[in-house]
From Swiss-Prot:
The modification Phosphoserine is found at S184. Residues 299-309 have a biased composition (Acidic residues). It comes from Homo sapiens. Residues 139-418 are annotated as: Disordered. InterPro entries: ARHGEF5/35_N. The keyword Phosphoprotein applies. Pfam families: ARHGEF5_35. It comes from the Eukaryota. This is Rho guanine nucleotide exchange factor 35. Keywords: Phosphoprotein. Residues 266-278, 323-368, 394-404 have a biased composition (Basic and acidic residues). Residues 217-237 have a biased composition (Low complexity).
Length: 484
């Protein structure tokens, strides 16, 4: 019996367990009921003693395990309702799990091991939510160990004490029970202290969230330089926002700058358009003044325009009186202008007629074709013409011998259709093919082709083109007469 007890370990007396002031009331009640049942059965069966001790140690271990597991499970989130409803279920589950012999061997038997187990789980070292601090409770054992301070959560003390403070804490913490937050191991940081100070009120302000920079700082993921850069960016954003609401008018300054630039560009364009319009108006006004002052812009040449411009400049320098007189002179009625144009045309026609007459006389003299009534006036001018006429007559005779006689036909001026337009001109027509005739007599001066407004009567006297051939020095005089 003693060997078996040594294997399973000596179970501490119940008084040592009762000294725990932190054990919940429900596990204590269950242990008391089990102890009473065991004492009633001691006298009935002598072999039941070992079973009692074994069962008592198992129950004690399960109770301690229940306390630790319950603290771990209830710490992250507090339910709205009391924890009394949850206790029976947890106790039954833990008791069933601890009845297996494999679990008995894994459980530490000494009280110091149990104390270490209560402090061993890493979840107990997690950062507390809001401003919950660990409670320090003195603990002393009957095995001669020194007094040690054990850290416990406020939830466990509230279960044992059952005071009204626990209920108040549960009510305040029930608002955040729906959101279970998990944090990294505790690190002393100013961000956490600020967060704890702000959370002492028991409520979290709506619309305010923990910035991502602070979270990353608390987790130790950001470099100090990056933190400074992020803080500067946050200050710049706050400056952009100004007096506006959250996420509203963030880029107000940038938009205002763009609008100002657009307005400046539009103003410059408007000024340029106004200047162009003014220049156009001035140019049109000057053109209108010129049209009104001159009165006849179409009838003037370039030289006349230049002269008038020079005169206007001189008048402008001379004074306003001369300018007014010039304007009066330039404002000529249309009738006077028409009369002046008619006079100019008549004088031009008269001059052209004189020129054409002179050219006709000069051409006839050069060709040696005398007109009737003018042979006796200038006998000296026919000397050169006679020699040329003799040479021409000889060439014609040679041509007649080779090609046959040619019959020149003189067209009377009465039958000529061009008699009215070209007076004093006769046309030599040769109808015999193969003959080459000279048409110098037919050539007319360009002055004769100019149109004449007044019809000129034709002279009905026939013009003899062969008069130059009838000279005393001509040996072929008879032949020429026979031909005629």
């Amino acid at each position: 019996m003693e060997a078996e007890e040594a294997q399973h370990g000596a179970s501490p007396p119940i008084s040592a367990i009762e000294e725990f002031s932190i054990i919940p009331e429900a596990p204590m009640r269950s242990s008391q009921v089990s102890a009473l049942g065991l004492e009633a059965q001691e006298d009935e069966d002598p072999s039941y003693k070992w079973r009692e001790e074994h069962r008592l140690s198992a129950t004690q271990q399960s109770e301690l395990r229940d306390v630790c597991d319950y603290a771990i499970e209830t710490m992250p989130s507090f339910p709205k309702e009391g924890s009394a409803d949850v206790e029976p279920n947890q106790e039954s589950l833990v008791a069933e799990a601890c009845d297996t012999p494999e679990h008995w061997e894994a459980v530490p038997q000494s009280l110091a091991g149990r104390q270490a187990r209560t402090l061993a789980p890493p979840e107990l070292w997690a950062c507390p939510i809001q401003s919950e601090h660990l409670d320090m409770a003195p603990f002393s054992s009957d095995l001669g160990s020194e007094e040690e301070e054990v850290e416990f959560w406020p939830g466990l003390t509230s279960l044992t004490l059952g005071s009204g403070q626990a209920e108040e804490e549960e009510e305040t913490s029930s608002d955040n029970s729906g959101q279970t937050r998990y944090y990294s191991p505790c690190e002393e940081h100013p961000a956490e202290t600020n967060q704890n100070e702000g959370a002492e009120s028991g409520t979290i302000r709506q619309g305010e969230e923990l910035p991502s920079e602070e979270l990353q700082e608390s987790q130790g993921l950001l470099h100090p330089q990056e933190v400074q850069v992020l803080e500067e960016q946050g200050q710049q954003e706050a400056g952009f926002r100004g007096e506006g609401t959250l996420r509203e008018d963030v880029c107000a300054d940038g938009l205002l700058g763009e609008e100002q630039m657009i307005e400046q560009v539009n103003d410059e364009k408007g000024e340029q358009k106004q200047k162009q319009e003014q220049v156009q108006d001035v140019m049109l006004g000057r053109q209108g003044e010129r049209m009104g002052l001159t009165g006849e812009p179409e009838g003037l040449n370039d030289g006349e325009w230049e002269q008038e411009d020079m005169e206007r400049k001189a008048q402008g320098q001379g004074g306003p009186e001369q300018g007014e007189e010039r304007k009066r002179e330039l404002q000529v009625p249309e009738e006077n202008r028409a009369d002046s144009q008619d006079e100019k045309s008549q004088t031009f026609l008269g001059k052209s007629e004189e020129v054409t007459g002179k050219q006709e006389d000069h051409g006839i003299k050069e060709k040696g074709v005398p007109v009737s009534g003018q042979e006796a006036k200038e006998p000296e001018s026919w000397d050169g013409g006679r020699l040329g006429a003799v040479g021409r007559a000889r060439s014609r005779e040679e041509e007649n011998e080779h090609h046959g006689p040619s019959m020149p036909a003189l067209i009377a001026p009465e039958d000529s259709p061009h008699c009215d337009l070209f007076p004093g001109a006769s046309y030599l027509v040769t109808q015999i093919p193969g003959t080459q005739t000279e048409s110098r007599a037919e050539e007319l001066s360009p002055a004769a082709l100019s149109p004449l407004l007044e019809p000129i009567r034709c002279s009905h006297q026939p013009i003899s083109l062969l008069g130059s051939f009838l000279t005393e020095e001509s040996p072929d005089k008879e032949k020429l007469l026979s031909v005629l």
